[in-house]
C-alpha cells in the first residue's frame, strides 16, 4: 500500500512539473514597469508575453515584439538587448528570470549562449560617402546627398532608424520656415545667432554656428517634403520669439517618412551595423570597418565618412571621466556610446573639450530606484519647482530658481555637477501642490513667465501617494522633525540649512544665493519630506573639433581628409552649459546635416 502511495505521489509531482504553468513578473523599463507572463512546461519556456507597459513604440516596441520569441527559441535569458532598446530588453529579461525562479527552477540553467552566425565572416563594400548614424544630422545629410545623385550608404547601430533621438524628441528650433510664415511669425538667423552666441560666450565656433543656423530652415522644409507634418510651438522658455517646431506626425511614424524619402532618392541603409574603426591610409580616412548584428565584419571603402552617432549618453566611462562617478539616467538613445569620439581620436582628431555638457530633463528629477525618470510620479516633478534643494551633505549649493526657470540648461548643469541633489518640503507644500498647483500656490507670479507657460493649472493630485511610493522604493524619506529627516540620507548639515532657509523666507530675502523671493516657501509644518534625485539627460554635448564647414580637425587644427562630423558629435557647434533656446540641439543637428552634405559634395567635386 505504501509503495502505491509513494508511486502516486511521485507521479503527481512529475505531472505537476510537466504541466504548463503561467508565471507573472515585472521588470523596470525605460518608462516604468513592464508586466510579463511566462509559460513554463516541463522545465521548458513555451511562451513569453509582454503585457501592460508604458514603453515607447520605438525603440521599446521593437524589443517587445522581437525578444519574447528569441527567448523561447533559444531557451535562454543570456541574450543581447535588442539594439536600441536596452532598458526595455533588460526589463523583459529580468522579468523572465524572476518567473523562472518563481517556478522553482535555476536561472543559470537558462543562460546558454548561441554563437552568432556571421562570426569570422569578413565582407567588403563600397560607397562614395558613408554616414555613421541615422539620426537628425545623419539623415539630413543622407537625403541631401542622395537627392544630388551621390552614392550614399548609411549604417545605423540600431535595429531601426527610429532609435535615434532626432525622431523621438519634441522638435527643432529653426529660422525662416514656411511653418512660421503661415502663422505670421518672424524668426531670423540674426535673432537666433545673437542669442546662441551670447549663451556660448563665443566658446562655440561663430562661423560654424552662423552657417548651421542658416540651414535650420532648410532642414525643416526638407522634412516637410518627406511628408512629415509640423507646427509651431509656443515660446515656453521666454526666448522672445517662436523658433521651436513640433510634429503633428506621431513619433512612431516619423522614421518611416524619412527612410522612404532616402531610399527613393537612391540611398542605401544598413541597420544593425555599428561603426567600429575608421580605415586610414597616409593620414586620410578612406572608409570604415563595421560590425553587423550577426557578428560579421564589414569593411566599407569610401571617399568620405560622416560621423553622426549622437554623442555618448550610453557610455558611463565618458560620463565619469568628465563628471565623476555619478549616475545620469538616460532619457534618450543609449546606443550613443561615444563611437565618433573614440574613432575620431584613433584617427588623430582633436576633442572640443569646452563643449562637454548635457541636455538636462526639464520635467523633473530622476532616480534609478524609481525607474529613472517617471512622468507619472509627481515626486520627481518637484525637483524642478524651485524649492529648497540640497547636496548630500544637506547644504544648499545654488540658486534654485534656475531649476524652475532654466532646467534644460543652467539649472541642469548645476545639479549635474552636484551628482545627487535633494528636495526638502513640508506638509503644507505637499498639500498645496496636490490641491491647487505650484503656480497658484506661489500667487500666480507675473514675473515667472516660464511658470505661466509650463506650470499654470498643473495640479499634482496624486503627490501624496507618489511620495509614499517613493519612500517605499527608497528614494524619499518622511519624518516628524528635520533632525529625524536628516538621518534618512545622512545629511548632517540639513537642520542648520533649514533653519537659515526659514529665516530667509521670513525676511523675504535670500542672503545666501539671492533667489527670487516668490520661491522662498518656508519648511515649518511636519511631517517633512526629502526626495533624492539623480541627474537625467536627453542627450550629451561635446565631441570632435571641426572647422566652420564640419571637416574634423587634427591637433594641428588641420582637416583630416575624408572625415566629417554632424549633430552633437560636432563639438565645435555646441557649448557648456547647453543653449537656452528650446530645441536648439536637434535644430542645429538637422542644420549641420545639410551643411555637412554640401561640404562633402563640394570636396568630392574638387
Summary of predicted features, one role per range:
Residues 147-167:
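Glycine-rich FAD pyrophosphate-binding loop
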Residues 248-303, 341, 347:
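Helical element adjacent to the flavin cofactor pocket in flavoenzyme catalytic cores
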